[in-house]
Amino acid sequence: MVXWTDXERAAITSLWGKIDVGEIGPQALARLLIVYPWTQRHFSTFGNLSTNAAILGNPKVAAHGKTVMGGLELAVKNMDNIKGAYANLSKMHSEKIHVDPDNFRLLAEITTICLAAKFGPSVFTPDFQEAWQKFENAVVSALGRQYH
């Protein structure tokens, strides 16, 4: 279990309230597929992923990015039991989809980059980033739990 300070909880909740999952999610997933092209193997049913432009314009990438980002709400609402909240997702990604657990870390890093670019230093301050990184690390750990 992660021990959260009141300031960290407030930062994560505040930042989450500002996030448009329909904007950040597709952006983050598209960047993942472009920057780390080996991750595309999990998305063979998404159609054309042959170029950066194809990935950025792919409606299935956008829809799944929104779903993935929206899934973080589960962690925001269950900050005291993220591992329990993500148990089924972890099992699915481990046993059914066979996602390399390092991909969760890569997506978390890219999500942080997207948030920093979107909100800038006046909102995404070092304190907010510190809390967000701690939150993302907890999510990554929870998603990778079934791999151990």
From Swiss-Prot:
Gene3D superfamilies (UniProt xref): Globins
Gene Ontology annotations for the cellular component aspect, listed alphabetically: blood microparticle; haptoglobin-hemoglobin complex; hemoglobin complex
UniProt GO BP: hydrogen peroxide catabolic process
Pfam families documented for this protein: Globin
Domain of life assignment: Eukaryota
Chain ranges of the Globin domain: 3-148
Transmembrane segments: none
Tissue: Red blood cells.
InterPro entries referenced in this protein's UniProt entry, alphabetically: Globin, Globin-like_sf, Globin/Proto, Hemoglobin_b, Hemoglobin_oxygen_transport
Entry keywords, A to Z: Heme, Iron, Metal-binding, Oxygen transport, Transport
Binding residues annotated for heme b, in chain numbering: H64, H93
Record-level Gene Ontology MF annotations: haptoglobin binding; heme binding; metal ion binding; organic acid binding; oxygen binding; oxygen carrier activity; peroxidase activity
Membership in a protein family: Belongs to the globin family.
Subunit and interaction comment: Heterotetramer of two alpha chains and two beta chains.
Annotated function: Involved in oxygen transport from gills to the various peripheral tissues.
Name assigned to this protein: Hemoglobin subunit beta
Organism annotation: Decapterus maruadsi (Japanese scad)
Highest classification ranks of the organism: Eukaryota, Metazoa, Chordata, Craniata, Vertebrata
